[in-house]
Amino acid sequence: MSQLYASLFYQRDVTEIFSDRALVSYMVEAEVALAQAQAQVGVIPQSAATVIERAAKTAIDKIDFDALATATGLAGNIAIPFVKQLTAIVKDADEDAARYVHWGATSQDILDTACILQCRDALAIVQNQVQQCYETALSQAQTYRHQVMMGRTWLQQALPITLGHKLARWASAFKRDLDRINAIKARVLVAQLGGAVGSLASLQDQGSIVVEAYAKQLKLGQTACTWHGERDRIVEIASVLGIITGNVGKMARDWSLMMQTEIAEVFEPTAKGRGGSSTMPHKRNPVAAASVLAAANRVPALMSSIYQSMVQEHERSLGAWHAEWLSLPEIFQLTAGALERTLDVLKGMEVNAENMHQNIECTHGLIMAEAVMMALAPHMGRLNAHHVVEAACKTAVAEQKHLKDIISQVDEVKQYFNPSQLDEIFKPESYLGNIQDQIDAVLQEAKGEAK
């Protein structure tokens, strides 16, 4: 992506993890781990592994990235020209040790392992971001647990809720995101080492012990078998990121709608140069929401490519594996960027309680129609109560009067409720159901005390 847009859509640390320089550094790390693992079990001399490790410490500064980029276009992947350059760097230190660089491995072993190392570090950042969003949403849910506002369905006013309930639901989504991240780690953060067709025939009868030592060197999990052609691990990582981005996309949709001029209930935090218009000085645009929604729009398209990459030929694929190199880094960067902007809004959101109250009142009591119906239902049955309230609603709309004024004159209603009882029925805060219980449950879950 253009650097001009990076600050709008990405997060700096995750973008750095997926930079060219970082990728090559992870590949160097994989090659060093391979050499040390093989030396540990006697496949190559320890002296060679020591030289390779020593040379690797300065290798990143000696790699010719321009030449690497040109050669990658000819070779079909970065590993082939990378290994040539790394071998030359080691050769400058010790010609004999250079013979053991990339011993027994194939290009995909190094690239897949480097990819997993990238995922491990990027996932740690994403997890921390989600944790911060979770904690902030919990805090705000507690702060606004009694702030009554309109609940909306099909973009229409429905029944009263509280802002704290909305935020508790968001917090609960973040909790599930954290659970998903934790659930996949052992399954997906694993090393790849299989040689040309996954058999490690190049290492003869020492393949299994080398794989074990290799994974331990990298602090990655060891798999029962190679996974060159079975890409479900990559897909699972991307899928969790896709869910996270979708979750924050839903939140951004909500707060952007609440920022509409006619609603004006919640606003993104202000900052110099933020949210303005080039032609309309009065505008306060939901810039963070635009960024998050763009990510939530883009990630599903990238996920389509990731899912299609599962259908691979035989032991190692042509093209499908390569498509991951384009999609996965972008998914990570967009997810991290969306989380960063969501956290900013959660921390600095501005709430207009007066507008929330005015929006509740703008229907002149119609939003309390269900409350009236349910209060009448025990006396006359739900269906009859529905008919009575429905007729009153139509009259209130036609005469442009408050529903309470109309319903209070209905004989069937006067029979059961006096004016003070009707006043209580029409209070939005009296018709919030079990919202407070739900908020408590979300807060307790965060303490490990889920009911």
From Swiss-Prot:
GO terms for molecular function: 3-carboxy-cis,cis-muconate cycloisomerase activity; lyase activity. The keyword Isomerase applies. SMART domains: ADSL_C. The keyword Secreted does not apply. One of its GO terms (biological process) is 3,4-dihydroxybenzoate catabolic process. Keywords: Aromatic hydrocarbons catabolism, Isomerase. It catalyses: 2-(carboxymethyl)-5-oxo-2,5-dihydro-2-furoate = 3-carboxy-cis,cis-muconate + H(+). Pathway: Aromatic compound metabolism; beta-ketoadipate pathway; 5-oxo-4,5-dihydro-2-furylacetate from 3-carboxy-cis,cis-muconate: step 1/2. Its EC number is 5.5.1.2. Homotetramer. Belongs to the class-II fumarase/aspartase family. Catalyzes an anti cycloisomerization. This is 3-carboxy-cis,cis-muconate cycloisomerase. It comes from Acinetobacter baylyi (strain ATCC 33305 / BD413 / ADP1).
